[in-house]
């Protein structure tokens, strides 16, 4: 798109406008294209994700998937999750990045205030822009899924632990669980 080709490993910033050196209008076009249903449905699963999440659900843990995707991407995102055997996991879209410009009162859309009213003891995050949001949850352990765009980011505090894949995420979860029993 726009004649720009940046390999995945070279995506240095979560802010794609900065990574690809885009104009405001190019960035808006990219964000729209990236959230078209056909594009969302074609994303590959990160190895081990559905297996690990389903393991936690099978163990009786309450699991939610909370994304900063636009509110109108809920249906294709829900469909993708269902196709990847995550139909038991509720999905919520939260305006984490201030991109939503109109109020939508769907049960699966949350404001930041609604999100902060929830309680979590474990989170998995890869967006440096969202680290601040998960910092609100007292006592929450945060597994930071290493990505090229977050690897250079300083972690906010010792509740944040870097993980290379879902096996490491699950180990961090198991250690947290062992400490709680």
Task: Enumerate the language-model features and the residues they cover.
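Short, charged, surface-exposed secondary-structure boundary motifs
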Residues: 99-105, 151-158, 172
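Active-site neighborhood of HAD-like aspartate-dependent phosphohydrolases
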Residues: 1-31
């Amino acid at each position: 798109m726009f004649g720009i080709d940046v390999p995945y490993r070279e995506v240095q910033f979560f802010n794609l406008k900065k990574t690809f050196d885009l104009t405001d209008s190019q960035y808006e076009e990219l964000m729209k294209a990236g959230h078209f249903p056909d594009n969302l449905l074609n994303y590959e699963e990160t190895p081990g994700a559905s297996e690990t999440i389903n393991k936690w659900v099978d163990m009786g843990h309450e699991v939610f998937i909370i994304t900063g995707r636009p509110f109108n991407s809920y249906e294709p995102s829900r469909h993708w999750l269902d196709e990847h055997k995550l139909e038991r996991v509720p999905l919520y879209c939260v305006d984490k990045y201030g991109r939503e410009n109109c109020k939508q009162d769907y049960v699966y859309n949350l404001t930041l205030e609604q999100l902060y009213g929830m309680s979590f003891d474990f989170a998995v995050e890869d967006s440096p822009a969202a680290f601040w949001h998960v910092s609100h949850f007292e006592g929450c352990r945060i597994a930071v899924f290493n990505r090229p765009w977050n690897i250079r980011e300083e972690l906010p505090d010792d509740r944040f632990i870097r993980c290379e894949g879902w096996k490491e995420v699950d180990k961090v979860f198991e250690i947290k669980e062992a400490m709680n029993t």
